[in-house]
Design a protein with these regions (language model features):
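A glycine-rich, acidic short-motif signal
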Residues: 1-231
Length: 231
């Protein structure tokens, strides 16, 4: 079973019958055939029944061209809470979401940073989680390490003298993306990245008590740090 969203109505989707085979292939890839790929490790959707009877999780959005009736793959992802969609992720945010969820191994980004068009790829990414108690409250440090490759600015390769500054800007950009994702997930009580598991490894009793009272996500803090370096 593969689950996905599309902005098309049922009638509009039926008019794209010539590309249904492409949709089926993409659905198969999303439910596990991506395991052989270098960039994805598992299916990129997750839905669970919430305590209120609605669905929690996230679903990919299959994009189509209404005019040419072409299938354009997955370009967005929607987050759900209690059956209601509340956030739409795309581009770098969607890739970061999959990375933090353990469902992607690398990033391939084309975005705007400080008014310039910046593109880059990553290699050898690794996430480390370090739990502690900061000011008496559970705290988690999430650190991303790895290599930056093929960095361009406005279509041109980065000069050696600009490499260090560009690396700092890219790391700062990824930190902002991760903070936005944290506000859209953990800070709302949606622990899609399983941060509570890491916190419980440090202090099981305290975290279990906070989970029982429903206050863990209000009290615990998460800091993300990107420390990528040039190849």
């Amino acid at each position: 079973l593969a689950a996905f969203l599309t902005p098309l109505t049922a009638e509009e989707l039926s008019e794209c019958e010539d590309v249904i085979s492409d949709v089926v292939r993409e659905g198969e890839r999303l439910i596990g055939m991506g395991a052989d790929e270098q960039d994805r490790t598992q299916s990129i959707f997750e839905i669970n029944l919430s305590g209120t009877g609605g669905l929690d999780g996230y679903l990919p959005v299959f994009s189509f061209s209404k005019e040419e009736k072409e299938f354009r793959g997955v370009r967005q992802m929607v987050l759900f809470r209690s059956g209601a969609p509340y956030a739409v992720l795309e581009d770098a945010a969607m890739q970061m979401f999959l990375l933090l969820n353990g469902k992607a191994r690398q990033l391939t980004v084309n975005t705007q940073i400080e008014g310039r068009v910046v593109s880059f790829r990553t290699q050898q990414l690794q996430l480390t989680h370090t739990a502690s108690t900061a000011g008496g409250a559970p705290h988690l440090e999430v650190c991303l390490t790895g290599k930056l490759d093929d960095v361009t600015v406005d279509g041109a390769p980065v000069a050696d003298k600009e490499e260090a500054e560009m690396t700092r800007e890219i790391n700062a950009y990824l930190n902002r993306e991760a903070e936005m994702l944290n506000q859209a997930t953990f800070a709302r009580g949606n622990d899609t990245f399983h941060y509570a598991w890491w916190l419980k490894l440090y202090d099981t009793a305290a975290c279990e008590a906070l989970l029982r009272t429903g206050t863990l996500y209000d009290i615990a803090t998460v800091d993300f740090s990107s420390e990528l370096k040039p190849v």
